[in-house]
C-alpha cells in the first residue's frame, strides 16, 4: 500500500469527531508558558508570517484559539474599492472553480459532487445557483483564519449540515468522493447585487469550531439533523455586511465554497486552480 493510500485509509478509520473535539478543548485551554511555547512551534513548523498580525508576539495569545483567529494589522489587506469587483473572501489557495453544470461542482480531477447536497439537500435553496459559478478556496494552517464578505450582502438564511470531518487538503479532495458535501458545514446565503450568494464554511479534522459574526459558535456541538434559520432582509433587524467585512471564522484552517447564479458575474481569467488568494484582492467582475 502506498503512503497516500495509507493516509486515506486512516482518514476513514480514525474517530474524527472525537479527535476534533479533544483538540478543540486543548486549543481553548489557557496554559501560560506552555501555550506560548506550542504557538511558537506552530509558527516555525508552518512558517506563519506574524509580521502581518496585529499582535506579532506569540506571548500575547492566551490560547491557541486566540492565535488561530488572530486579527491582522490595519491596512494589511486593502479591499479593492471598485464596486464591480468581487474580492477574495479569505487568504488561501483556489482548489477548484468554474461553472455549475447540471447541478454539479468539480471537487478534483475526475470527481464531481452535488450542489444540492452541499447546501443541505433543499431543492429550493439550490435552484438560484444552477448554471452559475463556484469557487473552492482551501485555507492552510498558516493562513489568516477569518472569512470576509466578497461583496455587499444581506443575510437571508443559514443552514447547519451535519457530517463527517475528513481532512480537506488536496490529497483527500482527490481521493474522498463528495468530500465537501459529506463534511460538517455551515451554509450562509446572502442577497446581493448579483442575486443570491452562497458561502459554505466546510469543517475538517481538528477544525475545532466554525463561527459566524451573527450567531457565534455554530458548531460544536455536532448535530445529527440539518437545521436552518431564516433572517429578515429588510428593516432594522436585517443583517447587512459590506464587502470586506468579517462574516465568520475557523478555529484552524479549512475550506470555503462560494456559489452564485447564472450570468451575474464572471471569474477573472487569471484565477486558476492553485492560485494563491489574498483577502481583498480581485476575484470576479460583476457583469454590466
From Swiss-Prot:
The modification Pyruvic acid (Ser) is found at residue 254. The record marks 253-254 as: Cleavage (non-hydrolytic). It is an enzyme of class 4 (lyase). It comes from Pseudoalteromonas translucida (strain TAC 125). Heterodimer of a large membrane-associated beta subunit and a small pyruvoyl-containing alpha subunit. Belongs to the phosphatidylserine decarboxylase family. PSD-B subfamily. Prokaryotic type I sub-subfamily. Its main location: membrane. The keyword Hydrolase does not apply. One of its GO terms (molecular function) is phosphatidylserine decarboxylase activity. The lineage of its organism: Bacteria, Pseudomonadati, Pseudomonadota, Gammaproteobacteria, Alteromonadales. Pathway: Phospholipid metabolism; phosphatidylethanolamine biosynthesis; phosphatidylethanolamine from CDP-diacylglycerol: step 2/2. This is Phosphatidylserine decarboxylase proenzyme. Is synthesized initially as an inactive proenzyme. Formation of the active enzyme involves a self-maturation process in which the active site pyruvoyl group is generated from an internal serine residue via an autocatalytic post-translational modification. Two non-identical subunits are generated from the proenzyme in this reaction, and the pyruvate is formed at the N-terminus of the alpha chain, which is derived from the carboxyl end of the proenzyme. It is a peripheral membrane protein.
Amino acid at each position: 500500500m502506498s503512503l497516500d493510500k495509507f493516509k486515506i485509509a486512516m482518514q476513514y478509520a480514525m474517530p474524527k469527531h472525537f479527535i476534533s473535539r479533544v483538540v478543540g478543548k486543548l486549543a481553548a485551554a489557557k496554559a501560560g508558558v506552555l501555550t506560548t511555547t506550542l504557538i511558537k512551534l506552530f509558527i516555525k513548523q508552518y512558517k506563519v508570517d506574524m509580521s502581518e498580525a496585529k499582535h506579532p508576539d506569540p506571548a500575547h495569545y492566551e490560547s491557541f484559539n486566540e492565535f488561530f483567529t488572530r486579527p491582522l494589522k490595519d491596512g494589511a489587506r486593502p479591499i479593492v474599492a471598485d464596486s464591480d469587483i468581487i474580492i477574495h473572501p479569505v487568504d488561501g489557495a483556489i482548489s477548484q472553480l468554474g461553472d455549475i453544470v447540471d447541478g454539479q461542482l468539480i471537487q478534483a480531477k475526475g470527481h464531481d459532487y452535488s450542489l444540492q447536497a452541499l447546501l443541505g439537500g433543499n431543492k429550493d435553496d439550490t435552484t438560484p445557483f444552477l448554471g452559475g459559478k463556484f469557487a473552492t478556496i482551501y485555507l492552510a494552517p498558516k493562513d489568516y483564519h477569518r472569512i470576509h464578505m466578497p461583496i455587499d450582502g444581506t443575510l437571508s438564511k443559514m443552514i447547519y449540515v451535519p457530517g463527517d470531518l475528513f481532512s480537506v487538503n488536496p490529497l483527500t479532495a482527490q481521493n474522498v468522493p463528495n468530500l465537501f458535501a459529506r463534511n460538517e458545514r455551515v451554509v450562509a446565503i446572502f442577497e446581493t447585487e448579483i442575486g443570491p450568494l452562497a458561502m459554505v464554511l466546510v469543517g475538517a479534522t481538528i477544525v475545532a469550531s466554525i463561527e459566524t459574526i451573527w450567531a457565534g459558535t455554530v458548531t460544536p456541538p455536532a448535530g445529527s439533523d440539518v437545521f436552518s434559520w431564516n433572517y429578515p432582509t429588510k428593516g432594522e433587524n436585517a443583517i447587512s455586511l459590506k464587502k470586506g467585512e468579517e462574516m465568520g471564522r475557523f478555529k484552524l484552517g479549512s475550506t470555503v465554497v462560494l456559489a452564485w447564479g447564472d450570468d451575474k458575474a464572471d471569474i477573472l481569467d487569471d484565477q486558476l486552480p492553485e492560485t494563491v488568494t489574498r483577502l481583498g484582492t480581485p476575484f470576479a467582475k460583476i457583469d454590466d
